[in-house]
Amino acid sequence: MGNLFCCVQVDQSTVAIREQFGKFDAVLEPGCHCLPWFAGKRIAGHLTLRLQQLDVRCETKTKDNVFVNVVASIQYRALAGKANDAFYKLSNTRSQIQAYVFDVIRASVPKLNLDDAFEQKNDIAKAVEDELEKAMSAYGFEIVQTLIVDIEPDEHVKRAMNEINAAARLRVAANEKAEAEKIVQIKRAEGEAEAKYLSGLGIARQRQAIVDGLRDSVLGFSVNVPGTTAKDVMDMVLITQYFDTMKEIGASSKASSVFIPHGPGAVRDIATQIRDGLLQGQATTTSH
């Protein structure tokens, strides 16, 4: 109907390429245009100005010999001012862009190790975008943005990488646990040392109090009971201590079987041994 009345409609965000007798004549903007077909004019085709996206999957190898699939996303559009170049100079725009993407990725990724490739995704995308912009601008296309969407290693490589990361995390956790246990043991040892120190002070003070009490008892008994000697008082004190010890052993619920002599003669022998030991110690101190 439009051709019958020599009129043609061009939709929004689209341009039409008009030819006259097979030769490029003009680029028609959106709207209604007169197209006298009897003068040899016709519409050769339409070209969209909308933003388009092309996803490219490229297989390549990294510097450390790991095969990866690099997924790039290219956003591009035709320039209205160069619509004739975009329409006539390229027969398959998407294939041309894909070829440039393959070329840049396969030139960039093999220079990088796998870990570096993940870290430098933006650098790879920038290299692809620069190359595409330089090449496609001559054909009337603008490269809006280039993204490296993903880098996919082989499934076995991904599994190995996950195992390496898991092992590293377990190693860190084990080191932290060992360090915590070390701190606990150090603190426990410090606490035990402090407890033993305080216990030693308590025992020393207890023994000093016992010695002071015995000394006072011996002196008091000697004064109040005429005719007694210090030896008699010491024998009495030792007997008292002996029976107190037996009483405590018998009263303890956790006591083991203890066999000790219990007759008066045995007490006398113990007293003699203690007294002789004290005299020998005193003699040794005096000789030195």
From Swiss-Prot:
Q: Give the residue numbers of the N-myristoyl glycine lipid attachment.
A: G2
Q: Which residues form a coiled coil?
A: none
CDD domains per record: SPFH_like_u4 (cd03407)
Identify the keywords attached in UniProt to this record, alphabetized: Lipoprotein, Myristate
Which InterPro entries does the protein's record reference?
Answer: Band7/mec-2_domain, Band_7, Band_7/SPFH_dom_sf
Instruction: Say yes or no: keyword S-adenosyl-L-methionine present.
Output: no
Do you know which Pfam families this protein is assigned to? Band_7
Q: What does this protein do?
A: Positive regulator of hypersensitive response (HR)-like cell death. May be involved in potassium ion channel regulation.
Q: What is this protein called?
A: Hypersensitive-induced response protein-like protein 1
Organism whose genome encodes this protein: Oryza sativa subsp. japonica
Gene of origin?
A: HIRL1
